Amino acid sequence: VNAIFNNAGVAQGGTVEGNDYADYEWVMSINFWGVVNGTKAFLPYLKSSGDGHIVNTSSIFGLFAQPGMSAYNASKFAVRGFTESLRQELDMAACGVSASCVHPGGIKTNIALTARMNDSLANVTGQDANQARQQFNDQLLRTTPEQAAKVIINGVLANKRRILIGGDAIASDLMQRLLPALYQRLVVASMGLAARFAPKGKSKPLTE
């Protein structure tokens, strides 16, 4: 075994007050513990090979936080912290194994359409859950899986610590670096404006 890609993930939307404890447990069990379990299961084999790489998928939301996504944000920030710590340990060990943390922007998958969302999300988006899912899917998921895979492979070959996928991820990374505290106010203002003018009305069946 020379490479492992921990990529499984789910999404959930709702306010902290509106979420149940079970919502956090579900997201963390897949998004974070899936990465931990996959890493620990294969790390001994990677080290035995003398030449290996661990690729853990965080998210654009592992770079900055957004209201209504506390469970998802927490899981992806956790993946980032875990992977950065792991990378430093591997660098110190000089064992021939390395690690990269991937931060995708909007990738054209079913993650938005299959996301679990509750009614409290309307307090943030101004829309019901189905409308929010569809709008996120239609407007924010731009990069194809094939494009994402190419960026990841190139990043692994270059032994990058952080792999950003998509212009949205690059812009978000820059925003967080330049405005580590102020960006939160910008997010609140922009999302408040978006919620105010969000399409309302009867939700339609979800389409891919």
Explain the meaning of each model-derived region.
Residues T39, S75:
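Active-site helix of classical SDR
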Residues E17, F64-S70:
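Active-site loop immediately N-terminal to the catalytic Tyr-X3-Lys motif
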Residues T15-V16, D20-W26:
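Substrate-binding pocket helix/loop in short-chain dehydrogenase/reductase
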Residues N7-Q12:
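Conserved NAD(P)H cofactor-binding loop of Rossmann-fold oxidoreductase domains
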Residues G14, A41-G50:
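A short helix-coil junction within the Rossmann-fold of NAD(P)-dependent oxidoreductases
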Residues S59:
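Residue(s) in the substrate-gating loop at a strand-loop-helix junction
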Residues D91-G167:
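SDR active-site lid
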